[in-house]
């Protein structure tokens, strides 16, 4: 039977309750490129919604919009951002419901999945603005078909909180909801900055970040959401000195480096399958239990909602969550 170490981070009391174990990652129970010089975007000068808009999207396409009364999104995170800006949707992919927990309503069409969007359903929904991800190949490949169908669309990429702020600011300009940019954008930036200020003079712990799935595990750097946050919090990622880990996670190399912390983010539909892979291929080795991170209960499973999916209005929570693990003595200050 798999054993585990569980630490419960309680934000209100800033305390951690720990159940001891020896081999499997500490499972965090709470669901909850930035620096102090990151983008300090300002809200729209007027609360009146824009009448038309021209901009260059993440793939370099020039986008011209004259209306956005019927907006659809092929990525749940971006659908949520549009709603956070005060917009409404006529269509979204199933991840908006299954992963983001959005209540779309009966009148909102389901447009397939993120990796298999349904072009026929998209056309039937008749959007005047379609929001897509620049990081999903199937969506990138739809550009010509969408153009031929006369569907205005734009590609976005969100790797860090500054990207989220830029997207939210644009959407709030479109909806005329300056107040929501302040509430869901500037307030979030303030939360992040407060955490970064608290940790700026702390030592730099070494970390290994692993993205685990049912058939493998990959070391990740700042090309990953959690990796960006770890970097901003002052952690030194092993992949910066051991780039070979990006191609192949060598247990021998990990043991030799002996990081202070090991973080795991799972992907795929089955978290248990991903953790089974970790158990069979890493934890079963007796040397794994001798790692400093495992010995000191610093082998941690991160919650998907904060470190796999885009946290959107919860970026501040993501930063605080990791900061309190890296620097527990600051937990009360971070809150």
Indicate where each model-derived feature is located:
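Alpha-helical, coiled-coil/dimerization segments enriched in small aliphatic residues
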Residues: 96-98, 218-247
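Bacterial Sec-exported substrate-binding components of ABC uptake systems
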Residues: 2-9, 22-77, 179-208, 325-335
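Extracytoplasmic ligand-binding site segments that recognize negatively charged/polar headgroups
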Residues: 138-141, 157-170, 204-225
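A short, structured surface patch at a secondary-structure boundary
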Residues: 75-125, 129-135
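Proline-aspartate-enriched helix->loop->beta-strand connector
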Residues: 119-132, 151, 251-264
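C-terminal motif of bacterial Sec signal peptides marking the signal peptidase cleavage site
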Residues: 17-21
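Structured C-terminal subdomain patch of bacterial secreted/periplasmic proteins
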Residues: 165-166, 170-173, 179-182, 196, ...
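Short helix-initiation/N-cap motifs at beta->coil->alpha
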Residues: 57-58, 109-119, 242-251
């Amino acid at each position: 039977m798999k054993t585990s170490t569980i630490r419960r981070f309680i934000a209100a009391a800033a305390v951690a309750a720990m159940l001891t174990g020896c081999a499997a990652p500490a499972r965090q129970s709470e669901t909850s490129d930035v620096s102090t010089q990151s983008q300090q975007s300002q809200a729209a000068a007027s609360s009146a919604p824009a009448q038309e808009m021209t901009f260059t999207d993440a793939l370099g396409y020039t986008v011209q919009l004259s209306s956005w009364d019927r907006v659809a999104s092929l990525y749940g995170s971006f659908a949520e951002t549009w709603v956070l800006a005060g917009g409404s949707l006529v269509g979204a992919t199933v991840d908006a419901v299954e992963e983001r927990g959005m209540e779309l309503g009966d009148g909102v069409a389901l447009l397939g999945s993120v990796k298999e969007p349904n072009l026929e359903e998209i056309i039937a929904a008749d959007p005047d603005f379609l929001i897509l991800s620049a990081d999903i190949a199937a969506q990138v490949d739809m550009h010509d078909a969408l153009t031929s169908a006369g569907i205005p669309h734009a590609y976005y990429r969100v790797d860090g909180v500054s990207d989220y702020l830029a997207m939210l600011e644009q959407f709030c300009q479109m909806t005329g909801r300056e107040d929501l940019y302040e509430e869901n954008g500037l307030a979030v930036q303030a939360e992040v900055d407060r955490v970064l200020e608290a940790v700026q003079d702390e030592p730099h712990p070494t970390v290994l970040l692993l993205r685990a799935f049912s058939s493998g595990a990959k070391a990740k750097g700042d090309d990953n959401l959690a990796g960006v946050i770890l970097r901003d919090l002052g952690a030194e990622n092993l992949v910066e000195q051991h780039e070979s880990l990006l191609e192949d996670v060598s247990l021998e190399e990990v043991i030799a480096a002996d990081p202070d912390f090991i973080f795991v983010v799972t992907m795929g539909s089955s978290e248990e399958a991903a953790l089974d892979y970790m158990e069979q291929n890493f934890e079963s080795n007796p040397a794994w239990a001798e790692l400093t991170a495992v010995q000191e209960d610093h082998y941690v499973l991160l919650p998907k909602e904060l470190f796999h999916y885009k946290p959107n209005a919860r970026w501040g929570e993501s930063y605080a969550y990791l900061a309190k693990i890296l620097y527990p003595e600051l937990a009360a200050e971070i809150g």
